[in-house]
Amino acid sequence: MSRSLKKGPFVANHLLKKVQKLNDLDEKQVIKTWSRSSVIIPIMIGHTISIHNGKEHIPLYITDLMVGHKLGEFAPTRTFKGHIKKDKKSKR
């Protein structure tokens, strides 16, 4: 079930305030956030936001094609290192 249109997209208040402050000052700084569930909105375009993946912050430059997606979609939390080539247990 999707979010109601009358509510609007979810953006964490602290993140929204930081983006608006940088827009007012006309500055470009890296914004560090742990809010992976926040939706990218048009006022974020052109900013670099560092998203926490559970271990480190991954910098992400926001473009117009990302609007409507969540920040967490662009910072994967799991790393796949590949299957073991010579695994004798799985052959049994």
From Swiss-Prot:
Pfam families on file: Ribosomal_S19
One GO biological process term: translation
Gene3D superfamilies, sorted: 30s Ribosomal Protein S19, Chain A
UniProt GO cellular component terms: chloroplast; mitochondrial small ribosomal subunit
InterPro entries assigned: Ribosomal_uS19 (IPR002222), Ribosomal_uS19_bac-type (IPR005732), Ribosomal_uS19_CS (IPR020934), Ribosomal_uS19_SF (IPR023575)
GO molecular function, one term: structural constituent of ribosome
Domain of life, per lineage: Eukaryota
Record keywords, A-Z: Chloroplast, Plastid, Ribonucleoprotein, Ribosomal protein, RNA-binding, rRNA-binding
Subcellular location: Plastid, Chloroplast
Job of this protein: Protein S19 forms a complex with S13 that binds strongly to the 16S ribosomal RNA.
Family to which this protein belongs: Belongs to the universal ribosomal protein uS19 family.
Name this protein carries in UniProt: Small ribosomal subunit protein uS19c
Organism of derivation: Tupiella akineta
